[in-house]
Swiss-Prot record:
Organism: Aspergillus fumigatus (Neosartorya fumigata)
Gene Ontology terms describing biological process: methylation; verruculogen biosynthetic process
Family: Belongs to the class I-like SAM-binding methyltransferase superfamily. Cation-independent O-methyltransferase family.
Keyword Methyltransferase appears in the UniProt entry: yes
Enzyme class: transferase
Record's subunit section: Homodimer.
InterPro entries, per the entry: COMT-like (IPR016461), O_MeTrfase_dom (IPR001077), SAM-dependent_MTases_sf (IPR029063), WH-like_DNA-bd_sf (IPR036388), WH_DNA-bd_sf (IPR036390)
Name of the protein in its database record: 6-hydroxytryprostatin B O-methyltransferase
Disulfide bond entries: none
Key words of the record: Alkaloid metabolism, Methyltransferase, S-adenosyl-L-methionine, Transferase, Virulence
Biological or metabolic pathway of the protein: Alkaloid biosynthesis
Site (Required for binding 6-hydroxytryprostatin B): R202
Length: 342
């Protein structure tokens, strides 16, 4: 109950856009604050909410009882990218969790995206299934932008580990599948300037990437749907933070489409979180990874996978693929797994 109240109250204030209406310096009385909100709320009720959240560090009051920012809530004014992530989580990260039980009743496997927690949250009243995560975002440009901005922040914090995650010196040509606007490719090619990299993604993302003025000459961009056959022949194919967004059946489709292009000696490289065995590693690390696993389930009906699960998924797609190694760069939440085609 304690954490539910903490999370639910802060979520409510974020969705009411209260932090946006509080001045960064100074304060604002409750009567004036409620007049700025798009959603009507009684000043006394708003006061009750804020007088609770101030005790956990979100918003505060001055000596006269007017509302002012705390360091945590000031992020909504000072840091738009992080604020966008918080708003996205208020809409999509928390609410689907209350549909987990209902989702299990409809889909005990946890694999049906249209009966997953988020789909049930977004469904029409009385329906037994709903839209997928990506379909929801397609109709919600505000949260779509928050999602992409959040992914950019997340990627910026993790990209630095990519250059040291694999011996890129042995690779001459690389296909970065689902590589967005080429941020990861740029890190690799700046550290290993001999590599020729093809970045593949959806048409609208590739169009945006091509408009950037800082493209490296060794990076080319190509429109590609990874559920269709891979058109490029290369030394290595790279899936970074892709498979954890998809259930096992869809991951099998993705890997098999790459398999059609593999030649002897080519490598499949997958960089994703790898779930530990229970009790393996630190409690903090395991908690973070398993929280991510449940997050993938609630949003996508997907999962984080253990090494055994990842190997089984890949090697069942193509018997020519022999597992080589797993390497986790120091400080990274994701590991690099490599297979060679024999």
């Amino acid at each position: 109950m304690t954490q539910a109240v903490d999370i639910g109250t802060i979520q409510t204030l974020i969705r009411l856009e209260v932090p946006d209406q509080v001045p960064l310096t100074g304060s604002i009385p409750y009567d004036a604050l409620v007049k700025k909100l798009k959603t009507p709320v009684d000043p006394e009720l708003l006061q009750r909410l804020i007088r609770f959240t101030r005790l956990v560090g979100f918003l505060d009051e001055d000596a006269e009882g007017a509302v002012k920012h705390s360091p945590m809530s000031a992020i909504f004014v000072n840091d738009p990218d992080t604020a966008g992530q918080a708003r996205f989580m208020a809409d999509f990260g928390i609410r689907p969790c209350s549909f987990i039980y209902e989702s299990i009743k409809l889909d005990p496997s946890g694999e049906a995206a249209r009966q997953g927690p988020l789909a049930l949250m977004a469904r029409e009243p009385g329906a037994r299934e709903g839209p997928t995560f990506f379909e929801v975002l397609e109709k919600d440009p505000v949260n779509r932008k928050r999602w992409h901005d959040g992914m950019a922040v997340h990627n910026d914090s993790m990209v630095r580990h990519v250059a040291g995650a694999y011996d890129w010196g042995t690779v001459q040509s690389l296909v970065d599948i689902g590589g967005s606007e080429g941020h990861v490719a740029a890190v690799i090619v700046n550290a290993f300037p001999h590599i020729q990299i093809t970045v593949q993604d959806r048409p609208e993302i590739i169009e945006k990437a091509r408009q950037r003025g800082d493209r490296h000459p060794n990076i080319i961009f190509e429109e590609h749907d990874f559920f269709t056959p891979q058109p490029r022949i290369a030394d290595a194919y790279f899936l970074r933070l892709i498979l954890h967004d998809w259930n096992d059946a869809d991951c099998t489709r993705i890997v098999r489409q790459i398999s059609s292009a593999l030649r002897p000696g080519a490598r499949l490289l997958i960089m994703d979180a790898v779930l530990p065995e229970p009790g393996e590693g630190s409690l903090q690390s395991e908690r973070r990874l398993r929280r991510s696993d449940i997050g993938m389930y609630t949003l996508f009906s997907a999962k984080e996978r253990s090494l055994a699960q990842m190997r089984r998924l890949v090697e069942d797609c193509d018997s020519r693929l022999r597992f080589e190694k797993l390497y986790t760069p120091p400080g990274s939440h994701a590991s690099m797994l490599s297979w060679i085609c024999e």
